[in-house]
Amino acid sequence: MSNKMWGGRFTDRPDAIMEEINVSIDVDRHLYAQDITASKAHAAMLAAQGIITANDAKNIGKGLDTILSEITAGKFTFKRALEDIHMNVESRLAELIGPAAGRLHTARSRNDQVATDFRLYVRDVLDETDAALAALQQALAERALEQADTVMPGFTHLQTAQPVTFGHHLMAYVEMVARDRGRFQDARKRLNESPLGAAALAGTSFPIDRHATAAKLGFDRPMANSLDAVSDRDFVLETLSAASICAVHLSRFAEEIVIWTSPLVGLIRLSDKFTTGSSIMPQKRNPDAAELVRAKTGRVIGALNGLLIVMKGLPLAYQKDMQEDKQGAMEGFAALSLAIRAITGMVRDLEPEPERMKLAAGEGYATATDLADWLVRTLKMPFREAHHVTGRIVGLAAKKGVALHELPLAEMQSVEKRITKDVLAVLSVESSVKSRTSYGGTAPKNVRSQAKAWLKRLAKDTKTR
């Protein structure tokens, strides 16, 4: 005879391989707090509905509190033979309070139980991620305000394109992270419905109050269809999707840090706190924190792809395949959390090299567009003609091996005789960034205004969170 808690139907014990492939406690033990919280809400509702006695509910609640304390203190023994977190908790509850523990599972299945637990877990992840991203935005906006006047090269195709400010570059990531936070917040809204009470798949004949348990657990409402309630994992997929986009943003920034800290580029410097050395080359300072962010963010994308593949062929309702929804997701969430904290630390730690940045900003004829704009504004030249004239002037400068502002005026006039010495005023990198005053442009005053606005907004968010 099977000794499993579900073993009444069975006359033989499971094969050892069956037990090995079926066990999930190594992963879902991380749901212990959510499992206990949901069970307490379920027990209270059962008592309120007269399905179990108030005394049984009281004893169940006390027993669950004891189990929570044991797990938190590291004194709880998780048993693989009991398969999962639900059976481990229920078994220990029976040891503590006796037969009343068996009443807890009335009008409930492990199908809706695990769906509830994992929703609560992912909701916690969403809230923690939002707070971590807000801290990253804070760090970025503070550094942007500090570096609003620091000129650096802006790039397209990884080639010097136009001068920008370091503050402007940092503010670009503030905006990216804002979209990330918006996606996580939207995912939370759709997640926040309770599957508890859907039972195995068809609901229950007991007069339960699903609205009461939903409210007790902080959900907006119970899910409207019991089949959907136990078989839905959209909330994990959507969270992992938002996490994957966020991971891409973090990885892009990490890549920039790797490039900028290279001695060949030298735009920024990381302290010893976020670099490591070499076991053979004494001089090395490697940006390993940034490189590891770049690598670990791939785990997030992998978790999304893995769960999509698990879910794509499953008919309604619950299938055992769905037991595989947690490990990859949890690892992905952990990788994202670490990456956010690492990037936040590096943002606070990094120091720009202003002179090198300024020099690099002027390389590659980065103020050529400023020359073309001057021709349009001053000489009323059509932009396409100004583009052509500027290209010829750049060609002359390149042939002579000089910067645009170093090219003699006579050489410029050989291409366009109406050019005057006034053009020199727009060819410095400082004048270039100051002129970019259009909304969203890199002008220092724009950067300061946007950084201050974001810091004010973030301070307000902190008060209301």
UniProtKB/Swiss-Prot annotation:
For the keyword Amino-acid biosynthesis, the answer is yes
Tell me if Oxidoreductase is a UniProt keyword of this record: no
Top EC class for this record: lyase
Reaction catalysis annotation? 2-(N(omega)-L-arginino)succinate = fumarate + L-arginine
MF terms (GO), sorted A to Z = argininosuccinate lyase activity
Pfam families (UniProt xref): ASL_C2 (PF14698), Lyase_1 (PF00206)
What coarse category fits the chief subcellular location reported for this protein?
cytoplasm
What pathway is it annotated to?
A: Amino-acid biosynthesis; L-arginine biosynthesis; L-arginine from L-ornithine and carbamoyl phosphate: step 3/3
Q: Where does the protein end up?
A: Cytoplasm
Q: Name the UniProt key words of this record, in alphabetical order.
A: Amino-acid biosynthesis, Arginine biosynthesis, Cytoplasm, Lyase
* One Gene Ontology biological process: L-arginine biosynthetic process
May I have one GO cellular component term?
cytosol
Enzyme Commission code: 4.3.2.1
**Which family, according to the similarity comment?**
Belongs to the lyase 1 family. Argininosuccinate lyase subfamily.
NCBIfam families listed in its UniProt record: argH
Protein name as it appears in the record: Argininosuccinate lyase
Organism per entry: Rhodopseudomonas palustris (strain TIE-1)
Name of encoding gene: argH
